[in-house]
Amino acid sequence: MQQKSSSQKLINVGFGNFVVASRVVAIVNPSSSPMRRLREDARQEGRLVDATQGRKTRSIIITDSNHVILSAIQAETVGQRYTQEDAD
């Protein structure tokens, strides 16, 4: 994984997109109704970041700034990458 010079850990969320690991609050599966509402609310409020490159959304990442990031990578995979970054 790549690191910034300030030693903040980054998580690869697919297609060359990264999220600062310390800002992540939750990594969730997008299939439930509450997660669909969360995504729609974030879109309407301008807090949605779509990192899917036009592919199917497979995970939703919620940050401490209340931004919602859509990823085409499975939630389990993103979670494993997050855990690996915590271990380093």
Curated annotation (Swiss-Prot):
HAMAP family registered for this protein in UniProt: RemA
Lineage: Bacteria, Pseudomonadati, Thermodesulfobacteriota, Desulfovibrionia, Desulfovibrionales
PANTHER family, A to Z: REGULATORY PROTEIN SSL2874-RELATED, REGULATORY PROTEIN TM_1690-RELATED
Name of the protein in question: Putative regulatory protein DvMF_1139
Annotated organism of origin: Nitratidesulfovibrio vulgaris (strain DSM 19637 / Miyazaki F)
NCBIfam families with a match to the protein in the record: PRK04323.1
Family the entry assigns: Belongs to the RemA family.
Pfam families from the UniProt entry: RemA-like (PF04025)
